[in-house]
Amino acid sequence: LGIKATNIVWHNTSVKRSDREKLLKQKGILLWLTGLSGSGKSTVATMLEQKLNDAGKLTYLLDGDNVRHGLNSDLGFSKEDRIENIRRIAELSKLFVDAGIITIATFISPFIKERVKVKDLLESDFVEIYVDCPLEICEKRDPKGIYKKARNGQIKDFTGIDSPYEKPINPDIVIHTEENSLEECVDKIMDYLEKR
């Protein structure tokens, strides 16, 4: 999408990202968790945020469902709306990262093209984390009861059932929630961040 507004100019401010990061004693970054519904994105992100918070880091967790209660409440689940959902979150995440915040985003984000756009916007501040869990395990978990509804035809365009999920080609981190414990998954991300 292009900018529709005319007669606007970017206003530079005197406080820069480096000033905010120095104040916070941390670097802003976007940790983007992608995977099927029920794969464990929100569960992993919640524990990850707690561990980072316990370590004295300023974080913000952007959860796919929570964001749809406010900022993206006008969006449905058509392909176009999913694309706009991710675009808005990418722009919001860029602002949070510029503020020096460790931003954790948990979005199915089923399309590679849209995740690449997020990466292009955030550049080296983007860390793609693929929460890999087989569809059949996600369906067994079904914490929201939505796979059952999708299989019964009550929900259309449901990712993994009648709408595709495009697996990341070269994610920065892959976690396997059906093979590893929650703690092991979170520790893998923490180890990555410590080495970064």
What are these regions (language model features)?
Residues 61, 126-130, 172-174:
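Conserved beta-strand scaffold positions in the cores of enzyme catalytic domains, especially
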Residues 37:
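The conserved Walker
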Residues 132-135, 140-188, 195-196:
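Small-molecule kinase domains that catalyze NTP-dependent phosphoryl transfer to phosphate-bearing small molecules
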Residues 46-94, 98:
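Conserved substrate/cofactor phosphate-moiety recognition/catalytic segment
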